């Protein structure tokens, strides 16, 4: 298997990754239905940002250079190969203190109010998926009803939306037997699905990558 699958200790769950891909591109995760993960991490931009400073909510429903709306503080980082990084975001504010994103033994550290509360999750990317929906300028928006909610409250609203959607219940049921048997979709299940999709966004085997790893033969003319 791949280096990624060796470190995961299992094969990529393609069914779960496909579900995560759907959720990654769905504005249902934004409380005003006006932004998705892909709004700031666009596939047609190498899963990076089309803007010098990210635009999240209240946008003009365009992904690309003509996108308008309130700006965040920084450009959205690219999400390719993030599965291997022990620290995420430009200021490294999401971190696996073991130095390994696959290892939660040292805890996953986030700014308050999450702090170390997501350390029970199996990978740093699963924990990271808990954050964007709670950020007002990214996905939550500024409605007074939203501003009155804490982060867990916002995540509960997102989970309720998934549970109210028959197609999502069917798809989550394919990956989670408890959902198939009538249990509710939880936000953790969503986080696992999005992380599984991001596990597929690994691009580290170009000829230059192989050359850097010491494989010189056959690359003289590449």
Label each residue range with its predicted role.
Residues 1-222:
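Periplasmic c-type cytochrome electron-transfer domains
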